Every structure is written in C-alpha cells, then in structure tokens.
Amino acid sequence: MCILVLIETTILVGSLSTGGMFAKLNQNAKDIVDQRVINRSSYLQNEMLNNWSNLSQLTDHINTTAKQLVSEGKVDYEHLDDSSETATPLILAVVDQLISTMRSQHVTGAYIIFNNHDLDKGLEDKPGIYLRDLDPLSKASAENGDLLIERAPTEVVKSLNIATDSSWRPRFEFKKANIKYYDFFYTPYQQAISNSQEFSSTDMGYWGGSFRLRDSENEAFTYSLPLINDQGAVYGVVGIDITLDYLNKLLPSTESVSYTHLTLP
C-alpha cells in the first residue's frame, strides 16, 4: 500500500511539473501578494490624502488663536521667532489641539515651527514644539503618558507634564548645531513667502521625504502646511509625521517596502 501511494505521489508530482502546474501555483501566489500590495497601497494613499494631510481644522485653530493673542498684546507676529519666551504663549494656547489632531488622525508626530525671516538668509535656531506618539494604534493615555516631547521651550515642558525624549531640545537647533533647515520646514515656508497672496495654506501642503530629527533614531516622512495670517504674512509651519516603523506595522510582513521608493501624493 505504501509503495502504491509513493508511486501515485511520484506520478502526481511529475504531472504537475511537466504540466506547468507548479509555475501556475507560484504565479497565483505572486498575484495574490501583488493584489494585497495594491490594496494596501490604496489604503495608504487614502490615509495620506484624506486623513493624515487633513490639517485644515488645526491650522484654522492656530491662526484664530494667534490673532486673538495678538489683539490681547500677548503675541507679536514679527517677534514670534525671537526666542522661546516670545513663542511660549501661543504654543501653550494651541498644544491641546495639536495633541487632539495626533490622536484623531493616528499619526506618530506633530509639530509647529515659528519663523518670520527668509530662510535663505542664514541659519538661525527656531522656537516651536514637536511631539511624538510612537504607537498611535494603542489606547491613548488620559494624561498623555504615551507621548514624548522632542522639542519645546522649558516653560512648555513644565506646563504639559509630558515626558521629554532623550533627544529633547528647547528649540529647533539649526545654527547652534550647524545643520541645514529640515526640508519639511524650509520648502513649504519658502514656497509660501513667495505665493501667500495667490494660494491658500492648504494649496501649499507639502509631503516631505524621510528624515531623522537631530539625535533621534526614528526615521519618518512628513506633511506640512505654512501658517499664514490674515495679512498674508507667513509666520511658521505646522505638520505631522509618520515613522517608518509605524508604517511597517500597517503593512503585513510580505508587503514591507523600501521607503526611498515610496511615491507621495
């Protein structure tokens, strides 16, 4: 009986091989994987276009809050980037909305950088805030214990009661560290100072390629919008990041890709 089964198995294997069945099965498996990649790619594109890049409510809140603080004499657009102290009132007034945006859109980071100068005229350190949530899929902590502060003024850190990352700095250090401006900051800002009268902030949204925040191990790609006041003056950028580690969690292991080839909308 065993000999008969062995013979039948040998014949079956031979027929599959000579009939091209193995090749067909392999192709079918490849087609299934390819379709899963296409489906997941469509999912990611939908997230990028309709969720992660939906920052209009956040930018409106920042602009409205900034305008109110200016009218109260607590903030001056022309001096927002002078120091951490000049930017702190606005940061504290909008940080809850920044965190809310991170939560609702399930992103791994959110940031604001203030600036009032042409970035082509030299490197300067800039005030702002950068928050991280390395696991947006987990249940959010009511006290924000799952968040980390990457950049924020000391007074903001004290007020938020959120832990700082080991790479925390009170400012975005460009001149001090002698590093060029991050692309997610430089490109949308410079584009906006030349076009703020012709295009809205949303029109100038910018998907940036992968980068690492100085002294951070987390590689991420970004989406940024310029901050533009009622007079058309550009006073900073706001945006989100998606770490590549998190993106890999959204993809089954067979679909992990090289993000240097990721096509951004």
Where are these regions (language model features)?
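Conserved small/polar residues in nucleotide/adenosyl-binding loops
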Residues: T260-P265
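Extracytoplasmic/periplasmic ligand-binding sensor regions of membrane-associated signaling proteins
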Residues: P153-G239
